[in-house]
Design a protein with these regions (language model features):
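Helix N-cap at the start of a conserved alpha-helix in ABC-type nucleotide-binding domains
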Residues: 160-162
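Conserved ABC transporter NBD signature motif
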Residues: 56-68
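Hydrophobic anchor residue at the start of the ABC signature
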Residues: 138
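Catalytic Walker B motif of ABC-type/P-loop ATPase nucleotide-binding domains
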Residues: 149-152
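The feature captures the beta-strand-to-loop junction immediately N-terminal to the Walker
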Residues: 33-35
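Conserved signature/switch motifs of ABC ATPase nucleotide-binding domains
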Residues: 123-126, 144, 176
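Helix-to-loop junction immediately C-terminal to a conserved catalytic motif
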Residues: 48
Length: 206
């Protein structure tokens, strides 16, 4: 279970997040919605360990959490253009988790099969559609065995017709027991996938 308690963040003395609190149970999906400037992506970056908080607590199962337990699927996917699909997925497990190449490739293949991307192992990012790049980015994040998977605007870079496909993929991952946190401005999508929704608004005070 992920708990965020009274999280605050300022940039240049301007409050971006103030006293944000929520609880996300294991296996649930939370969407965080709000307009641009509301601090949604900043909140995700703090939870993922990519940004520091000014105050507040982040706990997993009641204990201070390790950002290594959190995977992120970035809005523009951030795939390495010079690596093929399989290499993109296996790079971090071999370097960070010290998995053998064979083990990392076996796990990557399972993830690609799960995400219906088998047969594309040797392709490069430029050969993939936006939806396919997203699936590779998800597989890459899952290869690190995260407790929680975060998405930054998962529908924004895709054709609107693919929204239902993304919804199904997120629900399929939920069935496997994965806890998911989704930043989005797409209210319809947010309502369709969420067990719970957190609405954030821009803060006007300095």
């Amino acid at each position: 279970m992920l708990e965020v308690k009274n999280l605050c963040k300022k940039f240049n003395n301007r409050s971006i997040l103030k006293d944000i609190s929520f609880t996300l149970k294991d296996g649930e999906i939370m969407t965080i919605v709000g307009p641009s400037g509301a601090g949604k992506t900043t909140l995700l970056r703090i939870i993922a360990g990519l940004e520091t908080k000014d105050s507040g607590e982040i706990l997993i199962d009641g204990k201070p959490y390790d950002p290594g337990n959190v995977g992120v699927v970035f809005q523009d996917f951030n795939l390495f253009p010079n690596l093929n699909v399989l290499q993109n997925i296996t790079l971090a497990p071999t370097m960070v988790l010290k998995e053998s190449k064979a083990e990392a490739e076996q796990n990557a293949q399972k993830l690609l099969d799960q995400l219906q991307m088998n047969g594309r192992e040797k392709q490069y990012p430029y050969q993939l559609s936006g939806g396919q790049k997203q699936r590779v980015a998800i597989a890459r994040a899952l290869a690190m065995n995260p407790r929680i998977l975060c998405y930054d605007e998962p529908t924004s870079a895709l054709d609107p017709n693919l929204r239902k496909e993304v919804e199904k993929m997120i629900w399929d991952l939920k069935k496997s027991g994965l806890t998911q946190l989704i930043i989005t401005h797409d209210l319809t999508f947010a309502k369709n996938v969420a067990d719970q929704m957190l609405k954030v608004q821009p803060l006007s005070e300095a």
